[in-house]
Amino acid sequence: MSKRGRGGSSGAKFRISLGLPVGAVINCADNTGAKNLYIISVKGIKGQLNRLPAAGVGDMVMATVKKGKPELRKKVHPAVVIRQRKSYRRKDGVFLYFEDNAGVIVNNKGEMKGSAITGPVAKECADLWPRIASNAGSIA
């Protein structure tokens, strides 16, 4: 992804275990009025025959709102995954996982639609998306 695509972020995205395939329903952790997000595609995945595209922490996905405000439902929104239940390994060797899968709705530039995030945000996501990091309550 280009620097502009991640909201002007710098630095490489390290490989992490992908725990959220297309079709997964994740919690919406911002104050936009959406309760959950249904992943319909993952940005930047080219694909392989019969393999479901999957997302991990820090990935931008295209999602629809299944529960929430009526004005958000039945539309496709870009979102960024901020937490996942599947454990992944950090460069220092520690394995980390969260108690839920969660994401936040953003625009195409990576700027958040909401103004607050409930719960922790993964450090990998905060490094890639500065606008999400600035709204995060805690970074884990």
From Swiss-Prot:
Chief localisation class: cytoplasm
Domain of life: Eukaryota
Pfam families: Ribosomal_L14 (PF00238)
Subcellular location: Cytoplasm
GO molecular function, one term: large ribosomal subunit rRNA binding
Phosphoserine: residues carrying this PTM: 17
Listed transmembrane segments: none
Swiss-Prot/TrEMBL keywords: Cytoplasm, Phosphoprotein, Ribonucleoprotein, Ribosomal protein
Recorded GO CC terms: cytosolic large ribosomal subunit
Record-linked InterPro entries: Ribosomal_uL14 (IPR000218), Ribosomal_uL14_CS (IPR019972), Ribosomal_uL14_sf (IPR036853)
Keyword Cytoplasm: yes
Presence of keyword Chloroplast: no
Modified residues (Phosphotyrosine): 38
Gene Ontology biological process terms in this record: translation
Protein family according to the UniProt entry: Belongs to the universal ribosomal protein uL14 family.
Function: Component of the large ribosomal subunit. The ribosome is a large ribonucleoprotein complex responsible for the synthesis of proteins in the cell.
Assembly mode: Component of the large ribosomal subunit.
Name of the protein in its database record: Large ribosomal subunit protein uL14
Organism: Pongo abelii
Gene name linked to the record: RPL23
